[in-house]
Amino acid sequence: MTTETGPDSEVKKAQEETPQQPEAAAAVTTPVTPAGHSHPETNSNEKHLTQQDTRPAEQSLDMDDKDYSEADGLSERTTPSKAQKSPQKIAKKFKSAICRVTLLDASEYECEVEKHGRGQVLFDLVCEHLNLLEKDYFGLTFCDADSQKNWLDPSKEIKKQIRSSPWNFAFTVKFYPPDPAQLTEDITRYYLCLQLRADIITGRLPCSFVTHALLGSYAVQAELGDYDAEEHVGNYVSELRFAPNQTRELEERIMELHKTYRGMTPGEAEIHFLENAKKLSMYGVDLHHAKDSEGIDIMLGVCANGLLIYRDRLRINRFAWPKILKISYKRSNFYIKIRPGEYEQFESTIGFKLPNHRSAKRLWKVCIEHHTFFRLVSPEPPPKGFLVMGSKFRYSGRTQAQTRQASALIDRPAPFFERSSSKRYTMSRSLDGAEFSRPASVSENHDAGPEGDKREDDAESGGRRSEAEEGEVRTPTKIKELKPEQETTPRHKQEFLDKPEDVLLKHQASINELKRTLKEPNSKLIHRDRDWDRERRLPSSPASPSPKGTPEKASERAGLREGSEEKVKPPRPRAPESDMGDEDQDQERDAVFLKDNHLAIERKCSSITVSSTSSLEAEVDFTVIGDYHGGAFEDFSRSLPELDRDKSDSETEGLVFAQDLKGPSSQEDESGGLEDSPDRGACSTPEMPQFESVKAETMTVSSLAIRKKIEPEAMLQSRVSAADSTQVDGGTPMVKDFMTTPPCITTETISTTMENSLKSGKGAAAMIPGPQTVATEIRSLSPIIGKDVLTSTYGATAETLSTSTTTHVTKTVKGGFSETRIEKRIIITGDEDVDQDQALALAIKEAKLQHPDMLVTKAVVYRETDPSPEERDKKPQES
């Protein structure tokens, strides 16, 4: 390399300075040219040109794209006077590129952008075309050579980000708002609804059948308006897409719900749509393929709350943003440094293997952007300095806090936009047999793995809260429609209407679910109801439970709270006893009182939002429901004078209700494995060892006995029988019944079980089965609270069926984070045929309702027709 001196160098300096000034002037006159672009590249490129004049041919390849003043510098060595013509040549050489953007309604928008324009220029043009002001939740995506989705960086030149010749982009939601109700404008919610509908159809957002129907009905109401019998004839929703695997049954359910939304505006329908969609477990989760340290395929999901880890479509861990100290990547490895826990001294680093370096960087960028947008008040400035280790990338847009402040300042009339009859997701797109898909620039290839498989498993493992949403996704309109079907006293009606709105929605959803089941002609519940009625009419069973205590609701929904008691209130005229009406009224009053106390607990619980894996303590205790206070239990004692007299030796001050998170059926049977309750509690204590395995095995006392449980969220109904002062009727046991043929109940007493599982797991009351005709009460002093705990067993006698349940809970702790696996084995034996499909469905539904934050990953059914040797030996003895 040579250094030039003398007058020639001065001429060159003049040549270098003169082209820069016109170029800067051209940048000002062209609105899409980014400011400050010409200086760094011009200086560096010109340095190469002045020092290496022997390579003009090599440099000429980049002239069109990088700097157009360089050619002038070469031609002006002998004739500097020609420099005056260079500005005209520069203005002509500035080229523009055609950008095609696929919008959320599948339409295309074309615009012309200067070739050196930054991503923000194109994004602003698209938002202006859409008349969108709350644009910080959205972004533009493009596909690279590997067909991977990438976010367009608004602070960098488009030309440096997209290498392919056609500039195709997709306008999508980048940050899903945790509470869509906080969006200011209807048009913003409309585009968010379009994005969620695309997510549902492509399988990225799994839903249950009930959720598909509900969200689909709101989408129809928003686009078609009120149901019109003349206009909407036949299957008028068959042309629209609502689910990956759409069935005729789903379309009929959507039309049935659509008819009930008369008077609901499109904006209100979209709000209801978003309020239900945000509860889905995969809402706003951006998935990326990865492998853990052992080489097992996993998925890393980034959302507003943190980083989620999925394996085999099951979420196995969650790292909340406050728990993460540092996010980094090196080559194809992605690392997160975890804040030490309460009992740890050092930080721990967890590494994941990504497919390649680009994937690791892409995931790192997504994490940086989500953390900055949702957690920080203002974006962090990029690091400054000549030598900076690592990437300088930082999120440069507005944070959610800044977006809300800006949205509050929006002062314009609501923009007009047309919700056209949906041509976006129509069945005609799949007439060729291919499944519907958005354009290639929109499809998210890095997250299509497990979610594609989830479409087949929606009924079982579509989402951790999909079943729980069935009790939350109804609207007041539906309540008005079905309210005349409920026969209640005026006093009870007023109490019911005083409940909060969420309780009303849960109540209505429970009734709707139960009604659909009871309408089936082959429903086992109808036969069971008849058996209970027959037992009630028998004179030999004066203390048999009334229809309100039947297990028909228990076998249908464990989430059925006060709604189950409402459903079966109509009196049965077949009862011959003259005093049955008085007993029903007493039962009703007691049940109403107990229901009110329980609802207070549920309202208290609904405000507890604890992450199951954000820390060790949170995961262990995230299912604590609440507790009764002394006043509530005193009223409970007054409503049960017989029990109050029996407990005179020690006054019970409080009763703690807790849901045992570790064993979904360890609470279920009280006949065996009862001494394991301290072990079961130890599994819930924060001071747990690194690995614990808890096994609670319960066996029946005889082939005639079936032990059942009452879950903590069950609505308790109790009454005192005049025939026996120690007999207490069990109310509505909210468990799934694993028998398909209803047993004929012959016992005279069903005792109520209230299992106490304290938050720390210590001092749980032991359950000792007493005689089947007498309720056995046990009091155990809690070392934590210092209160007596009232417990009793619940026994029922069947004729020919017996059930054995084995629960195996494995909890592995690694680095302060735990992984819980629950295996449950249910054996049903008896002479009568058992409908294994019914039993399996009930078992899965019970497991989901007990553990809404966990997924059912595997269900295996074995059927043996021959009876076991023990049963052969027992049958002669029973006869």
From Swiss-Prot:
Compartments where located: Cytoplasm, Cytoskeleton
Modified-residue entries (Phosphothreonine), positions: 30, 79, 475, 550, 685
Highest taxon listed in the record's lineage: Eukaryota
Residue ranges of the region described as Spectrin--actin-binding: 483-541
UniProt keyword list: Actin-binding, Cytoplasm, Cytoskeleton, Phosphoprotein
Signal peptide region: none
Annotated Pfam families: 4_1_CTD, FA, FERM_C, FERM_M, FERM_N, SAB
Biased composition (Polar residues): 76-87
Residue ranges of the region described as Disordered: 1-88, 428-501, 514-594, 657-696
InterPro entries given in the database record: Band_4.1_C (IPR008379), Band_41_domain (IPR019749), Ez/rad/moesin-like (IPR000798), FA (IPR014847), FERM/acyl-CoA-bd_prot_sf (IPR014352), FERM_2 (IPR035963), FERM_central (IPR019748), FERM_CS (IPR019747)
Major localisation: cytoplasm
GO cellular component: cytoskeleton; cytosol; postsynaptic density
Subunit structure: Interacts with AGAP2.
Protein name, as recorded: Band 4.1-like protein 1
Record organism: Mus musculus (Mouse)
